[in-house]
Each structure stands twice: as C-alpha cells, then as structure tokens.
Amino acid sequence: MEKIIEINDSIIQISDLNDRIYIMKLGKDVGELIKHVDSVCNEKKLSKVFAKVSGNKKELFEKNGYICEGKLENYYSNDDAYFMSKFFEESRKISKFSKEAEDVLNYVKTVGVNPHTKIDEKFHLKIANETDAEKLSKHYSKVFKTYPFPIDDPNYILKTMQTNVKYFIIEDNGKIVAASSCEMDIKNKCVEMTDFAVLEEYQKLGLSKYLLYIMEKIMKDNGYRVFYTIARSISYGMNITFKKMGYMYSGTAVNNTNICGNFEDMNFWYKLSE
C-alpha cells in the first residue's frame, strides 16, 4: 500500500513497498507529528522514517532519535535543509551495498566537472503533456522493476503534472527512450531532478546528462535557486552525470528506497543556481 495523507498541515507518505514513512511536508506542530509518525511505525511495523527538515527543526528531530544523513545548503531563504532518518530496526541501518557504493563514490571523486553536452540529432526532447501520461508510465515500468512512487500509473503521472512536476522525455522516432522530471518546491524555489529512466539499449549516449542540462536551464529561467537529486548509490552513470554537471555530494541515506527490486542506499547531490 502506498498512501499519502495529510495530518493537520503536514503531509506524509506511508509506504509498504519502501517499508517506511516519508515526511514530505512539515506543518506547524512538529512535536505532535513526530509522535504520530512513531505511533504509525510501531503499529504497522515499518522500519524507517525519512524527512527533509529545516535547520531550526534539526535538533528537535535529533532529540527524538533521528540522525542526519544529508544536507542541502540554502534550501530555505535563510536556512539549510537536512535529511533526517529514524530507524526502527537495527537491520535497516546496515547497508547491503556499502562496498559497491564506496567504489562508485571513489571513482566519481576522480571525475572532473564538464557540463558540455549534446545528443544525436535523431533524438527529440520535449516537455511531456497530459497526452503522454500513458506511454510515459509504460516507459517507467520497462525500466524499473520497483520504484518508490507509482510512476508506472498514468493517473499518478497526470495528477503530479497538474500540481508541481514537469516531465521531460526524449523520443527516437516517436518512441520514448529516456525520461526524467523536475519536482518543484514552488514556495522555496528549489527543485529535485529525479525520475531519470533510460532504456538499456540507449544508455551511454549522454541522454541523462542532456535531460539534466535542459531541466536546469528551464528551472533557472523560472527562478529556481537550488537543484538537487537523490541518486542510487550504486549507479555509476547517475552519480557521474551529476558530478560532471557541477553538483556536490552531501551524504547518503542508508537502505532508503525500494528501487529495481532491492532496498538501496541513496546519495544526495545538490547545486546552487549561478
């Protein structure tokens, strides 16, 4: 079950697939929210809570058993954002892919910044519209065995298109071969660069990097200040892409997301708009 619910003026996602609660938006009464989330986790036997909080709330979360796994500078107008996690099972704290993730990061450290990008002229990039929702959902279902949000559901894609998400697609002769999205925090003018999915036979052609370049350009033109991503820690391609585009690594969330059939660690990368 994947359920997004509002508690007073806070929003949380309760996810059986991810075996966690994701605090998506903090309301005013944070103390009561923390108690409520603890209660739900114990009742449903969920093993992790994950939240993005402002610096002035960080200490309150730490006092309630949360640890900081990552950071985004200047996310708020006069404060940073912190990714805070609380574990309800010891096994959830232990990474299954720590060696692979370490190898990826060590390699990525050797990669220089190189934002130059282009793709073959046969490809066509566009911002997706509502008529693309069905084939976009099918594209995502081809690429991901499991995913933390139901992007294989055209109704979910339609709903998010109508609120705060722009989807980008690259087509080859009318067929979607790569996709991504900008999940916009309209109030704070920050944006998550996410949902990158390239068909296997079209990988290593620079499509993700080109998508990111276009996404950044459009978001910057619309006044967005901070760009960030939460990338699979064992993916050489995505971590290299963000490093080449000038993003800074700022932490890792352990066993955070059920993606491609496993719980995986996720790396945080961010970049401030120039």
UniProtKB/Swiss-Prot annotation:
UniProt superkingdom: Archaea
Disruption phenotype: Cells lacking both ablA and ablB no longer produce N6-acetyl-beta-lysine and are incapable of growth at high salt concentrations.
Name of one Pfam family that matches: Acetyltransf_1
Keywords tagged on the record: Acyltransferase, Transferase
GO MF annotations, alphabetized: N-acetyltransferase activity
N-acetyltransferase domain ranges (all copies): 123-274
Entry keyword Transferase: yes
Protein's recorded name: Beta-lysine N(6)-acetyltransferase
The organism of origin for this protein: Methanococcus maripaludis (strain DSM 14266 / JCM 13030 / NBRC 101832 / S2 / LL)
Encoding gene, per UniProt annotation: ablB
